[in-house]
Regions:
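Flexible, charged surface loops at secondary-structure boundaries
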Residues: 1-3, 139-147, 168-170, 425, ...
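Anion-coordinating catalytic cores for phosphoryl-, nucleotidyl-, and glycosidic chemistry
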Residues: 2-33, 42-47, 189-883
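Short, hydrophobic beta-strand segments that form beta-sheet elements in well-ordered domains
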Residues: 4-10, 150-151, 174-178
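Basic/charged alpha-beta structural segments of nucleotide/phosphate-handling enzymes
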Residues: 11-145, 154-159, 166, 181-182, ...
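Structured, non-catalytic alpha/beta "coupling" segments that mediate domain-domain communication
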Residues: 83-96, 173-177, 584-592
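Acidic/glycine-enriched edge-of-secondary-structure segments
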Residues: 110-130, 147-150, 201-215, 457-460
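Conserved RecA-like helicase ATPase core segment
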Residues: 146, 159-211, 484
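Alpha-helical hinge/cap motifs
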Residues: 153-161, 421-424
Length: 883
């Protein structure tokens, strides 16, 4: 068996040579990169320092050493990566940093770091220059170890590796395979015995296209690839799509390739966060850096369900948590889990969750321990790599920049990647993206640590990025049989782009419209959009077209809320037990009532705002009501509310504020601490004003707060009635339930006073039913009379506390209740007839179901449908009043 060696520059070329060797049944063949070649020659299982080890040692050097100029870089994000990149350039250039150290303090600092790295390398590892020197010193056995050497795929050879190849040529035969395009780049081989074999240039079929945006370029590239495959002109492993740098197209490729199901291999790897292990690491980093929260912790631990520490947790453990609790601090989690542990029917989650949450709550300083204890396999590798690339405080950013190898086989797939890699294994069908003045060629930049005034760039980088882009362009062009040049008119932000100077002037460009109908679609969605007739016959298209037309019609249609009369789902929503809120929506927005109570639609969760700057009006009202309830209940049970003094009310209110603040921290999204304290003070003042409002005292008055009726849970423990008794609206089959803010009764339960506290802006005049928006007084009066037959008079009032507040008693309750019953009858008839149209409640700026309405409903939809709506609702329209 004859031993021979092939030296290649990239992993893509390694895959190709390995596949070719398998096809040829080759024996005794070694496929090596230059660093592997040096390690093989040096012997003793030596290898060049890896990227991860280099990052780790440079990070340690920054922590341990003292510097003249690099001291300020010690804690800066990206410092480790920048220093490693500079050191690699120095090593590639075959420069002796120790000899240059005396020139400037900057070079001295870098030489100090290099010495530290060299001294702390693990056994079996050497710096690149040292490894090459060791290999050259051990060339006597090169013929036996390597056999004949073939070098292929290189566009540029760094001086460090040139030294190795030139020395190796004296010990064994080297045959260098290249393309005629690179003849000038290989003049350094002429003094040696290296035999250079030039492959002649090909004359490719050249096409140039101009697209609208980078995303459009990706779409057209995938269409082109599918056309080549289905026409039989090319197979996937003969097709390459390249760019000088891939960042502007990567995300679009990832999404569109998944949609197209084309076999595409990402040469440069996939984004770590597009993989499951990357999501595990990223979600954990988010919790660690941004802090504990309900959403963040649940998401992270659900992704980590397979780690040993969480295997004892049931799969649905998170459903036991309160859905509205933000749980922003470790103490909140401890109290919440303590309450869950009191339920004997549920497992105790504390032994599993609390140690993990305590570790995560330590933040960035615990990053290494978090990765060690909570991650495994590739997720841990991603975590550790991100810690090497940057400080723990930037972990989420570092993870987002990482790439992991694509596990698909490039020998069976279309390849997408950077030109410098694809040029090492060019393909007959090539499409170049981004041929604009910005990308082909890219403009070179000075090294961040060794600019031109410190070290000549020609020494540090003999071939800059601009020269390399030109070389790679020529290599790909001259190696292809069919090549397409592609550029976009504008970038993703809309800026106009110039044409690359590398584009052949003799090739006329074809301008492609983004909305054009392609001959070959790259995916099913692309095909359907290209075939309008076929798309129009799909269920989704028919529904969309029908909705589009109906929303623009002056008549009311099914898309405006018209359904068959007697719909059982709507009937069930009507016959449910109602609150003042549901009846308000029934009267002011029948369509919203159906969405909310028949279909079960809900507005977005409040957890989407984990720490709002201010409480919204509804939440502030809940806070004030909680303060009123707890304070009044305490005072009533300690001598009676009617006999209390202002000092007693203030003292009880302070204690209630303390309890409620603790309770809300565990269950509600709250503003930052200082804003929350101010909100508590405002709510406390509002509650004090309400509790001290001068109201005439009833004889032998008893006060009840948060009084439930109709089967509603919670509220006052000592109700003056059966809390489960059915309350119905006379003349209707509507059942009521609710909670009265405050109920005062005299000793004989003959006279009653119902108070509904309001925390909004006080109106200038008596609001009445307010076009269906103020129903509480009338409904609560109905409930009190139904549940307490001895009651003769009910004073139902709205109380707006505060210096500019007022008390509004319901004028002529009998008339108001009769009017309410009448309009409720109209609303029920409208719903049962299938005419659930929008009302003034839908047009309100506070409509929390506005997301389900057409876009710009205020400007177009509501005015367009108003006339037809008004004609349909009849007398209900006069109750709504003027919008």
């Amino acid at each position: 068996m004859t031993r021979r060696t092939i030296v290649i520059p990239s992993r893509l070329a390694w895959h190709e040579e390995r596949f070719r060797a398998a096809q040829e049944n080759a024996l005794g063949l070694q496929i090596l990169t230059p660093s592997q070649l040096a390690g093989r020659l040096a012997g003793g299982f030596l290898e060049a320092v890896s990227q991860d080890i280099c990052h780790e040692l440079v990070r340690n050097a920054l922590a341990d050493l003292k510097f003249a100029e690099l001291e300020q870089l010690r804690e800066m994000p990206g410092a480790v990566k920048a220093i490693c990149a500079t050191l690699v350039k120095v090593w590639d250039a075959d420069m002796d940093l120790q000899a240059l150290a005396g020139r400037t303090p900057r070079l001295s600092d870098l030489a100090q770091i290099e010495s530290y790295v060299r001294d702390h390398l693990p056994g079996g590892m050497m710096l690149q220059r040292d490894l090459v020197s060791a290999a050259i010193a051990n060339l006597k056995n090169a013929g036996s170890v390597l056999g004949p050497v073939t070098v292929t795929g290189f566009s540029f050879v760094a001086p460090c590796w040139r030294r190795l190849f030139l020395a190796l040529a004296g010990s064994t035969s080297i045959e260098w395979h290249s393309i005629e395009t690179l003849r000038e780049q290989l003049t350094w081989t002429q003094p040696s015995s290296i035999g250079v074999v030039f492959k002649p240039k090909r004359t490719p079929t050249q096409t140039s296209v101009v697209c609208a945006t980078p995303k459009h370029e990706v779409v057209e590239a995938l269409r082109w690839a599918r056309q080549l495959i289905v026409s039989g002109r090319a197979r996937p492993h003969e097709i390459a799509i390249v760019a000088s740098s891939t960042e502007d197209w990567d995300e679009d490729f990832r999404v569109l390739v998944a949609d197209s199901q084309l076999p595409v291999h990402f040469v440069h790897g996939c984004s770590a966060t597009s993989t499951f292990p990357g999501q595990q690491a990223s979600s954990l980093a988010t919790v660690m850096l941004e802090g504990l929260s309900h959403d963040r912790v649940v998401r992270a631990l659900r992704l980590l369900h397979n780690i040993p520490k969480l295997k004892s947790l049931p799969g649905d453990w998170y459903t036991s948590l309160s859905p509205d609790a933000p749980l922003l601090k470790l103490r909140h989690w401890q109290i919440s889990l303590d309450k869950l542990a009191e339920d004997p029917e549920k497992p105790d989650f504390r032994p599993v969750l609390l140690p993990i949450l305590a570790l995560l709550s330590q933040g960035a300083p615990a990053a290494e321990q978090v990765g060690e204890e909570l991650l495994a396999g590739q997720a841990r590798a991603i975590w550790l790599r991100a810690l090497l690339d940057g400080p723990p405080q930037a972990l989420t950013t570092s993870i987002g920049r990482l790439r992991v190898p694509d596990e698909s086989d490039p020998n069976a797939n279309i390849i997408w990647g950077p030109a410098h890699t694809v040029a090492s294994a060019p393909r007959p069908f090539t499409r170049m993206l981004g041929l604009t003045s910005r990308h082909w060629p890219r403009q070179g930049r000075e090294d961040a640590l060794l600019p031109s005034h410190i070290l000549d760039p020609a020494l540090l980088e003999p071939a800059g990025v601009t020269m390399q882009d030109r070389i790679h362009f020529a290599m790909l062009r001259d190696a292809a049989g069919d090549i397409v040049y592609s550029r976009s008119r504008r970038d993703s932000e809309g800026r106009l782009l110039g044409t690359s100077p590398l584009l052949p002037s003799e090739v006329a460009a074809e301008h492609l419209q983004r909305s054009r109908i392609p001959q070959h679609a790259f995916s099913e969605s692309d095909r359907l959009l290209a075939r309008r007739q076929e798309f129009s016959e799909t269920e989704g298209a028919r529904s969309a077209i029908s909705c589009y037309r109906d929303w623009r019609s002056l008549n009311l249609t099914a898309h405006d809320g018209l359904v068959n009369s007697g719909d059982p789902v709507i009937e069930a929503a009507i016959t449910r037990t109602h609150s003042a809120t549901s009846l308000r929506q029934m009267l002011t927005d029948p369509l919203g009532f159906v969405w909310c109570y028949a279909l079960g639609w809900k507005p977005p969760s409040p957890l989407s705002l984990e720490e709002p700057l201010v409480l919204d009006k509804q939440t502030y009202g809940l806070l004030a009501h909680d303060l009123l309830r707890q304070t009044a209940a305490f005072l009533e049970s300690n001598g009676g509310f009617a006999a209390t003094t202002s000092m007693q009310i203030e003292s009880a209110l302070v204690e209630a504020t303390r309890r409620i603040a603790l309770e809300w921290e565990l269950t509600m999204p709250l503003p930052p601490t200082r804003l929350w304290q101010r909100t508590l003070t405002e709510a406390c003042n509002t509650a004090f004003s309400a509790l001290t409002w001068p109201l005439p005292e009833l004889k032998g008055q008893k006060t009840f707060v948060e009084v439930p009726f109709g089967g509603l849970e919670g509220g006052e423990d000592k109700c003056p009635w059966d809390r489960n008794a059915v309350v119905a609206v006379l003349g209707l089959d509507l059942k009521l339930r609710g909670k009265i803010d405050r109920l005062d009764l005299d000793s004989e339960s003959i006279n009653a006073r119902v108070i509904d506290y309001k925390t909004g802006r006080c109106p200038d005049e008596e609001p009445g039913l307010k076009n269906g928006q103020e129903l509480q007084r009338a409904l609560y009066a109905v409930a009190v009379k139904a549940l307490l037959p001895k009651v003769v008079t009910v004073d139902a009032a709205l109380l707006y506390p505060g210096p500019e507040g007022n008390l509004f008693s319901l004028p002529d309750p009998k008339v108001q209740i009769e009017e309410l019953i009448c309009v409720l009858q109209l609303a029920v008839q409208l719903l049962r007839s299938g005419q659930s149209v929008f009302g003034p409640g839908a047009e309100s700026r506070y409509n929390n179901l506005a997301f389900a309405l057409p876009a710009n409903a205020d400007g177009v939809y509501f005015p367009q449908k108003a006339a037809a709506r008004d004609a349909m609702v009849g007398n209900l329209r006069s109750f709504w009043g003027e919008n």
